[in-house]
Amino acid sequence: MNRLVNIRNQINFKSKKGKIYIAIIVAVFVILVINYIIKKRRWDRANPIFFSNSIPADTRAIVPSRKIKNSINKGHFTYMIWIYVEDLKYRYGVHKNIFTKGNIGYYSESQSPGMYISPKRNSIEIVLSTMANNQIINEKMILDDFPMKKWFSVAVVAHEKSVAVFLNGELSISKPFSGDIIENTGNIVIGGNGGFIKGE
């Protein structure tokens, strides 16, 4: 504390030299604040969280495509979502949308990826569009026996012509495709069914 008092006594803040010191301190402070704001905005763009809380899955939520950072490498992407399913009674016998990127509707062309709860079983169907011989083909993978009445995570990881699906961080499915995997550039449509969903 005595050092600060000594420094204050040595510098006359009303003099030209004192005003320069004040200007430098203010400039450094402003630069630090601007730097923090820029880094925070870059972090938020690179690591988006679309929903900070769970959303009821019987409510349809749309994440606009402009908020989604697409992969710079064709056929490389990862989607991870946390899901809670109470039971299979709601809309029994019908595919239930967890999320779809692109066209809405089970097995519609150019949805990649699409994730659905199977009509009558506790399994998740993952649909990806691939391109082979100038033709779009929908490929399907089935993740059987997901947990009921507790939260679980599902991650879909596409790498060139193969896809890996992880349930609670453990590899469950790995599948190569003959065509190139297409990542749709449309909106992400989440839910519209029942239960709760939380995704990043």
Go through each PLM region and give its residues.
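Extracellular glycan-associated modules
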Residues: 1-200
